[in-house]
Amino acid sequence: MSYPQGYLYQPPGSLALYSCPAYGASALAAPRSEELARSSSGSAFSPYPGSAAFSAQAATGFSSPLQYSSDPTGFPSYMGSPYDAHAAGMTGALSYHPYGSAAYPYQLNDPAYRKNATRDATATLKAWLQEHRKNPYPTKGEKIMLAIITKMTLTQVSTWFANARRRLKKENKMTWAPRNKSDDEDDDEGDGERVKEEQSEKAQDSNETSAEDEGISLHVDSLTDHSCSADSDGEKLPCRAADHLCESGSESKEKYEDEEDDGDEEDRVLPVKPATSSPLTGVEAPILNRQQEGSPRNSNKTNLDNGMSSSSQTPASKPKLWSLAEIATSDHKHPNLGSVLSSATSSSAAHNPSYPSSSLLGRHIYYTSPFYSNYTNYGNFNALQSQGILRYSSTAMTANEGLNQTVLSTSSMHKHTSDSVRTASNQLDQHYRPTNYESKKDPSEVCTVGVQPYP
């Protein structure tokens, strides 16, 4: 407990000290020893001749008792002797380092902290480096040990070794093999040079590896591009009917244009068009492809469908952008619908035996169907599949009834050409939306929604 200089502190026993003739009122007005011990110099040994505390004390009439005598009996009981280390006023001051400050014990001029690496410190580091020429990478424990010995910081030691390795490498005296950075050296600030050295020395080896990796990645990209937009020739017929619904679906537009370009002539010759991969029809679509098509392009689609059959249970396993294009542009959404509508489509079975119209219902029901409000559950679509591959809810059952009515009402249109198919698709949009449209979402937002996982 310290008091400012000039503060008159009178303990209860100080009233009896007025009888002391040698120390009158000047003794009581003098600064106390606690102020002397905790003076602004920050040192415990401030009341020496020449110090500010000593001169302030001498000015008040204490020049005679402050001689270098070992007898402190001339001091009152409430004043601790500046030479007595066991006085109450000195204990707090002696707890600090005599050369450091109490507020910040590690100042720049503190001998415990070394700004520059001295000759003896570098000699220790050089000796360690000479002994470990084949592996000049000290571990974390060795760095701490060297930092304690040389009185340097851990960053200084790391930087010194990094500079030494760079210097030896520049002088072609490198006798060690570059190695990877160990885990205990990740947080060192001076290891940036080491990483640069290792990267430059491993450049040739990494070039070969990166070339191989690049070839693999190019191969994967080519496969992905083939699956996304196989041979996009630019036939924009089927996508015109839904351009107002999908402004941002450029990828799906390219994919769908390509498929419709190849399947435009097959629509008049072959009974079934090739089905692309889709999480909804990943099981039955390859069967149709094997029965009807034999071209190499369709065999590639069959392989894609086989790959997607496993993901029909978990379509979230491939959360890519082209998955949306695959779903939005699949030709045959529901190949088992022919069994559901066998009586209604028997007259047109020669034209479309498995599905009435791929461009009519396969695409636009995905965007304009009223049960799309539950678009996070693919079970809504799978209510149409007779084998029940995926789980569906009661909402899908009610939506299935409305979809069957729509398919029955539009099945008579499927004998026409592609021009009449486009007209029928517009009629389906106008017929289907006002009846039981419950979705509160804008259909233009559908294209931006990726593949959603099952709840």
From Swiss-Prot:
Bias-annotated ranges (Acidic residues): 257-267
Keywords from the named record: Developmental protein, Differentiation, DNA-binding, Homeobox, Neurogenesis, Nucleus, Transcription, Transcription regulation
Any GO MF annotation of the entry: DNA-binding transcription factor activity, RNA polymerase II-specific
Induction details: By a combination of a neural inducing signal (nog/noggin) and a posteriorizing signal (retinoic acid). Inhibited in the neural plate by foxd5.
GO cellular component: nucleus
A biological-process GO annotation: cell development
Tissue expression: First expressed at gastrula stage 10 in a large region of the dorsolateral ectoderm that includes most of the prospective neural plate. Subsequently expressed in two domains, one within the anterior ectoderm (outside the neural plate) and the other within the neural plate. Within the neural plate, expression extends from the midbrain-hindbrain junction up to, and including, the spinal cord. Expressed in the placodes. Also expressed in specific and overlapping dynamic patterns with irx1 and irx3 during pronephric kidney development.
Renumbered residue ranges of the record's region Disordered: 172-214, 247-319, 418-455
SUPFAM superfamilies: Homeodomain-like (SSF46689)
Biased amino acid composition, Basic and acidic residues: 192-205, 247-256
Primary localization class, coarse: nucleus
Compositional bias (Polar residues): 289-316, 420-429
Entry-linked Pfam families: Homeobox_KN
DNA-binding region coordinates: 110-172
Family classification: Belongs to the TALE/IRO homeobox family.
Function (record text): Acts partially redundantly with other irx members in neural patterning. Required for formation of the posterior forebrain, midbrain, hindbrain, and to a lesser extent, spinal cord. Acts early in neural plate development to induce expression of some but not all proneural genes, and specify a neural precursor state. Also up-regulates repressors that prevent neuronal differentiation. Patterns the neuroectoderm in both the anterior/posterior and dorsal/ventral axes. Probably dispensable for pronephric kidney development.
Name of the featured protein: Iroquois-class homeodomain protein irx-2
Native species: Xenopus laevis
